[in-house]
């Protein structure tokens, strides 16, 4: 088997009926492998997302929580949704939506354009936040 890239740059394992998702940031790599489409994003909790928040978070998303990690969780969720959708040209603000973030339960509810709600998992570990969908 070979690992190659799809037309969108996503990893593909040629010759295998599996799906793979990969994300990396300084200090961490996250990988998910599943028999169904999957995606993952990882970011350090210390990254400052607040300056760019208005470019990817709607007013409704900014009102979901007063947790200081909300911008990071929404960013990771939208990156995960973008990868999961597998469609080029989706806009982080207008096409990808986060409807709920529950840090305690580790659940994010998101939506791609006008599609059905999707349940994503959220984990925090060692100063990193990971959001994935299997």
Model-inferred region functions:
Residues 1-134:
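Core catalytic alpha/beta fold that binds nucleotide/phospho-ligands
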């Amino acid at each position: 088997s070979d690992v190659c890239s799809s037309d969108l740059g996503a990893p593909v394992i040629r010759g295998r009926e599996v799906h793979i998702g990969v994300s990396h940031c300084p200090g961490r790599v996250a990988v998910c492998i599943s028999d169904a489409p999957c995606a993952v994003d990882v970011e350090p909790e210390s990254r400052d997302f607040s300056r760019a928040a208005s470019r990817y978070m709607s007013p409704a998303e900014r009102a979901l929580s007063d947790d200081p990690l909300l911008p990071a969780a929404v960013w990771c969720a939208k990156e995960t949704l973008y990868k999961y959708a597998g469609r080029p040209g989706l806009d982080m603000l207008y096409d990808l939506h986060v409807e709920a973030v529950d840090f305690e339960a580790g659940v994010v509810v998101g939506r791609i354009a006008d599609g059905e709600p999707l349940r994503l998992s959220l984990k925090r570990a060692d100063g990193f936040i990971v959001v994935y969908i299997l």
